[in-house]
């Protein structure tokens, strides 16, 4: 059976945490920061865990992720 390919877009955008959750960057910080409050911008820092349903789809794109 041939090897399965990992989707390049998925490996660049997502990481799998030690507990198996899919971690992603916060959405909503590409442009338009002027109209957002400072607290909104502050809360959008860092990464967040993806929902379980969406995480299952992303894990299917990365067949060799260790905690997939």
UniProtKB/Swiss-Prot annotation:
Protein name (database record) = Large ribosomal subunit protein bL35
* Cross-referenced HAMAP family: Ribosomal_bL35
UniProt keyword Ribosomal protein, yes or no: yes
Tell me the protein family, please: Belongs to the bacterial ribosomal protein bL35 family.
Biological processes annotated in GO: translation
Q: Which UniProt keywords apply?
A: Ribonucleoprotein, Ribosomal protein
Q: Which Pfam families match?
A: Ribosomal_L35p
One GO term of the cellular component aspect?
cytosolic large ribosomal subunit
Q: Which GO terms describe its molecular function?
A: structural constituent of ribosome
């Amino acid at each position: 059976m041939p090897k399965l390919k990992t989707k390049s877009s998925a490996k660049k955008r997502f990481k799998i945490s030690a507990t198996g959750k899919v971690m992603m960057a916060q959405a909503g910080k590409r442009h338009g920061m002027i109209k957002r409050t400072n607290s909104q911008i502050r809360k959008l820092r860092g990464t967040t865990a993806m929902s379980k349903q969406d995480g299952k789809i992303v894990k299917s794109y990365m067949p060799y992720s260790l905690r997939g």
